[in-house]
UniProtKB/Swiss-Prot annotation:
Transit peptide: 1-41
Domain of life: Eukaryota
Organism this protein belongs to: Medicago truncatula (Barrel medic)
Signal peptide: none
Protein's UniProt name: Tricyclene synthase TPS4, chloroplastic
């Protein structure tokens, strides 16, 4: 069971909930609070001693990317035509080709051709009567992974033939490193209750770790890469960057695919740099960082997060920029609620946001006034652009999710103030909202969908699980990486501490429980993606990408709040440094 019944029965996040929320928005009451901001001395406030910004925004403005030139775009288009012909060729190993194209970051150019090729592949299989018993482990696992990734109904029972009479995976499979890696990768597309894939994951994990020790080859590098973080859970754009470098070293590398992949990556990266320069000017113009110097100045990290959530395609600039704005505001308000604001001030701010009344700033302290105006202006600008383009007023939806997030922030602040350690389920029911995933995804939905319908809005309201599961993954990844630092700052509850306190277990046991909960939530999201898939495939991809960028950012620590050299190198690889 993923969580207890309180998780399964959570009401829609668009309906009022009894449990307080503490993230980025407001607390709605029937009447305004009849109190005013406290005159707390700055020296009396907590300080998080956050790491300063490590990026020079003036230097970012000087970025110049060679691949902005139209001749590269023309060359890329010619190469794409060659790749299309390859996909349509019935004599190629189509599954291997599709997998390579996908890992190289090229598949978005060929969605129609790939769909037709997979349909053709399945049709030929059916006509020829070929069954699974003639397939190798690699072929079977690759077939399963690709078909499930592309939404085909395929059962994991196809792996039964690789078991012995005792129901265990055959010992002889262990020496097939390529097949074992393919089975390992496939196991991460499992649904709840698919025991054979759980067994496959356990079997391959143990033996691949043993097989990779003391060896060196391109295949072993791939094994170590997947063991570090599974292929399906990786940010696809960063994975393309890594795979291009790996693929170039292979003797069987196709030169057309390799050149097409390099050009495509660099062209999209040049678009990202233009987006980043615009966002750098926006952030500097907002003037929030110097006025709210107690908080984290993380424009670059927020842009990286937005780029990771958004499909890695040049036409999604508006979505990247919109999410960068949202993420930047979330980061600062999180610091207000976690560290700087007094409880009275947080109550006032939560109520002000929920009322969405500009006059509410009159009773806010000065530092909150500027942030309220920044939030008010940004959200209203999103609403204005959407009304202008679609005729739909999305303001109630945006204010609602911001309000719910701030209520969740406020609840956490109260727990901390009262030195209260909540039960694990109470914490998580609040924390999946406070982590801000719903705010990010709701903005994404409206930024991606300019053809907004009543049916679509109903879908957004009535399918909360699609937003809840990636938010839980986001929260758990965050807690695993930041719990120690948060405790040092006196920020109180997180999932690990709550579980330890409630169950009387060690930190190691609690970590294992959270990791298991992460895996179970991924299974739930994998299934929800199929049975409750939104009309927009891009929004569906963005939902999964939220979970992926969470793993990426918190894989080695707090890559957002305290970015280290590894975090900086990831940003440079995706945004700043072209492939030679």
């Amino acid at each position: 069971m993923l969580l207890n019944s309180s998780f399964i029965s959570l009401p829609s996040f668009f309906k009022s909930q009894e449990l307080g929320r503490t993230n980025l928005l407001i607390h709605r009451n029937g009447s305004p609070l009849l109190c005013y901001a406290t005159n707390t001395n700055v020296s009396q406030r907590k300080s998080a001693n956050y790491q300063p910004n490590i990026w020079n925004y003036d230097i970012l403005q000087s970025l110049k990317h060679d691949y902005e030139d139209a001749r590269y775009v023309d060359r890329s288009r010619r190469l794409q035509e060659e790749v299309k012909r390859m996909i349509k060729d019935e004599n190629v190993n189509i599954l291997e080709l599709i997998d390579t194209v996908k890992q190289l970051g090229l598949s978005y150019h060929f969605e129609e051709e790939i769909g037709e090729a997979l349909d053709r592949f399945l049709s030929l299989e059916k006509c020829s009567g070929r069954n699974n018993f003639g397939r190798s482990l690699h072929e079977t696992a690759l077939r399963f992974r690709l078909l499930r990734e592309y939404g085909y109904d395929i059962s994991p029972d196809i792996f039964e033939k690789f078991k012995d009479h005792n129901g265990n995976f055959k010992a002889c499979l262990v020496q097939d490193i390529k097949g074992m890696l393919s089975l390992y990768d496939a196991s991460f597309l499992s649904y709840e209750g698919e025991q054979i894939l759980d067994e496959a994951n356990a079997f391959t994990s143990i033996h691949l770790k043993d097989l990779s020790e003391g060896r060196s080859s391109i295949l072993i590098d791939q094994v170590n890469h997947s063991l570090e973080l599974p292929l399906y859970r990786r940010v696809q754009s960063l994975e393309a960057r890594w795979f291009i470098d790996s693929y170039e070293n292979r003797k069987d590398a196709n030169k057309v695919l390799l050149e097409a992949a390099k050009l495509n990556f660099n062209i999209v990266q040049s678009t990202l740099q233009q987006d980043l320069k615009e966002m750098s000017r926006w952030w500097k113009g907002m003037g929030l960082a110097p006025r709210l110097s107690f908080g984290r100045d993380r424009l670059m990290e927020c842009f990286f997060w937005a780029a990771g959530m958004t499909p890695f395609e040049p036409q999604f600039s508006n979505i990247r920029k919109g999410l960068t704005k949202v993420c930047s505001l979330i980061t600062l308000i999180d610091d207000i609620y976690d560290v700087y604001g007094t409880l009275d001030e947080l109550e006032l701010f939560t109520t002000a946001v929920e009322s969405w009344d500009i006059n509410a700033i009159q009773i806010l302290p000065e530092y909150m006034k500027i942030f309220f105006l920044a939030l008010y202006t940004t959200v209203n600008d999103f609403t204005y652009d959407t009304i202008k383009e679609t005729g739909h007023d999305i303001l109630p939806y945006l204010v609602k999710v911001w309000s719910d997030m701030l209520k969740a922030f406020l609840q956490e602040a109260k727990w901390c103030h009262n030195k209260h350690m909540p039960k694990f389920d109470d914490y998580l029911n609040n924390a999946w909202v406070s982590v801000s995933g719903v705010v990010l995804l709701t903005h994404s939905y409206f930024l991606l969908n300019r053809n907004i319908t009543k049916e679509g809005l109903g879908y957004l309201e009535n399918c909360p699980m699609l937003l809840q599961t990636p938010s839980i993954i986001f929260r758990l990844c965050n807690d695993l990486a930041t719990s120690s630092a948060e405790l040092e700052r006196g920020e109180g509850a997180n999932s690990i501490i709550c579980y330890m306190n409630e169950n009387g277990v060690s930190e190691e046991v609690a970590y294992k429980h959270i990791q298991n909960l992460l895996d179970q939530t991924w299974k739930k999201m994998n299934k929800d993606r199929v049975i409750n898939s939104p009309s927009s495939k891009y929004f569906s991809e963005t939902i999964i990408n939220l979970a992926r960028i969470s793993h990426c950012t918190y894989q080695y620590g707090d890559g957002h709040g305290a970015p280290d050299t590894l975090a900086k190198n990831r940003i440079k690889a995706l945004i700043l440094e072209p492939i030679n």
